Each structure stands twice: as structure tokens, then as C-alpha cells.
Regions:
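Conserved CoA-thioester-binding segment of acyl-CoA-metabolizing enzymes
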Residues: 1-64
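Short Cys/His-rich "knuckle" micro-motifs
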Residues: 67
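Residue-level signature of transmembrane alpha-helix interfaces in integral membrane proteins
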Residues: 42, 76-77
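Short, flexible, mixed-charge acidic loops at enzyme active sites
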Residues: 70-75
Length: 77
């Protein structure tokens, strides 16, 4: 299996003590939101809501170009 064939998850979730860090992981598309991102962020927020030990949630974007470009217009069309 080649590196290109390995699909990365659209959203990464990491626990840092009492903080849940949600990373939108689509830097090649400026982290724009498609169906997988929407579901992944929603699931992570639900996870945080159900965990009494989570005191804060941080949402960030992968890469160094942008946080999130908005909706993925290519996925919508």
C-alpha cells in the first residue's frame, strides 16, 4: 500500500489533561468542511459533553495556511 492510498482521518481528537483538542485535518483543502468533518467534529463535541472531566474544547485546523476555509463547495456540487 502506498502512502497516497492511506487516507487520513478528516478530524483528529486529542485529550490533553482536561482539554479536548479537535483538529480539522484537511490542510490540502484549507480545512474546508465536508460531510466527514461535520460528523467528526459533531462526534467529538458530543464526546466532550458526555465527559465530566473535560473542562474546555479547542478547535483548530491542521497545517499553517488557514484555520478553516468554510464549506467544501466541491463536495456540495
Amino acid at each position: 500500500m502506498t502512502e497516497a492510498a492511506v487516507q487520513q482521518p478528516a478530524v483528529l481528537v486529542e485529550r490533553r489533561d482536561d482539554v479536548l483538542v479537535i483538529t480539522i485535518n484537511r490542510p490540502e483543502a484549507r480545512n474546508c468542511v465536508n460531510g466527514a468533518v461535520s460528523i467528526g467534529v459533531g462526534d467529538a463535541l458530543e464526546q466532550a459533553q458526555l465527559d465530566a472531566d473535560v473542562r474546555a474544547v479547542v478547535i483548530t485546523g491542521a497545517g499553517d495556511k488557514s484555520f478553516c476555509a468554510g464549506a467544501d463547495l466541491k463536495a456540495i456540487s
